[in-house]
Amino acid sequence: MRSLHGTGVALITPMLPNGKIDFKSFKKLLRHTSKADYWVTLGTTAESATLTRSEKTAILEFVIGNNTKKIPVVCGFGGNNTSEVINELESIDFTGVTAILSVSPYYNKPSQEGIIKHYSLIADKSTVPVILYNVPGRTSSNLSDKTTIQ
């Protein structure tokens, strides 16, 4: 894995008034942030929970295809339905992706054991390293130190 260090930019998803992805603006965003040490695409800042699977695929392909400076790319893949996250992971080509950023399950408030099982299943299926995304203010659950180490 390429080392991630420095400043990463969490990319938004520019949208047109008709609800379609604005790839022209997205290209400008990539140029504007091209001095970042890495990009985070499809994270919570990109409002990925509101995107369809085909939109996510199109965005990831667009970012990878326009990554002329070969900036490391971290791709957000998370959710509260472990099976669906795994299904998405298995359907995506991660060529050009350095790691995935996976938010802990939200809404259903899993136990620490549930969080461990969730991340273990994702890590087993992922072809790239998994970064644990702990944001208790949004997920209503907090990764304990012990859970993170496991």
PLM features: residue spans?
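Active-site beta->alpha loop and helix N-cap motifs at the rims of alpha/beta catalytic domains
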Residues: 1-142, 148
